Amino acid sequence: MTGNFRLTADDGHQLDAYEVCPEGATSGVVIIQEIFGVNPHIRSLVDRYAAQGFHTIAPALFDRVESDVELDYDGPGIERGRDLAMAVRWEPAMRDVAAAVTHLSVTGPVAVIGYCFGGSLAWLSAGELPVAAAVGYYGGQIHGLIDRIPQAPTLLHFGELDHAIPLEQVYEIAETHPSVEVHVYGQAQHGFSCDARDSYDADSAALAFERTLSFLAANGVTGIAA
C-alpha cells in the first residue's frame, strides 16, 4: 500500500500523510518533516524505511496553516519554512504526530524519526507519546527544550559544523540526559543526511542511517527482514 491519505487529530483537524505499508510489516515509523514540508526528500525517506520493512508515514504538519507545502532547499524556501513552522506551533504539531503514531500502533511498536524541525518534535515525542523509540536529526530547538525528560529510548544525530546548533549545546544536551545516545559527525553540517541539500555528507548520512536501524531494532522496532 502506497499513497496519500487523511489523518484526523484528536481535535478534529484533518491532515494529509504519505504512507507506505509493506506486506507483513510488524513495526511502524513516523517520519517527521523538516521545515520544507512533505517534499520529495521526505517521501523518499518514507520509501526508504518502508523498504526496510517498516509501515511508514509522514504527516503533513503544515496543513494546519497551508496545504500541499513542498519547499525547495534555498533562501526563499528556508524563509517560508521558518514562518510556517512558527505559525504551526508545538502543541498542534504534536497532536498531528500523535495521530500518526496512533494510526501505526495497530501494526506494532512505533518509532518516530524527525529531521531539523522534526528532530525537535521527535524529542518532544519521546517524552509525551507512546513510542518505542525516538530519533532526532539535528533538531535545532532541542536545547531550548532541554528540561523535557524523554521516557522512550532516544537517539540524536548532530553535525560538528552545524551553523545552527553550537557544539556547546550538543554537549549540554548529552550531559543533562546521559541516557540519551548522542552522536556528533565530524565535518558534517546542518542537513547532512539530506541528499537534496548542498550540505549532504554521504558518509555521515550512511553511518547515521545504520545507527538508526540498529537503535530501532534494539528497542523492538524491527523491519520484516529482521
Language model region names:
Residues 1-226:
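N-terminal cap/leader regions of alpha/beta-hydrolase-fold enzymes
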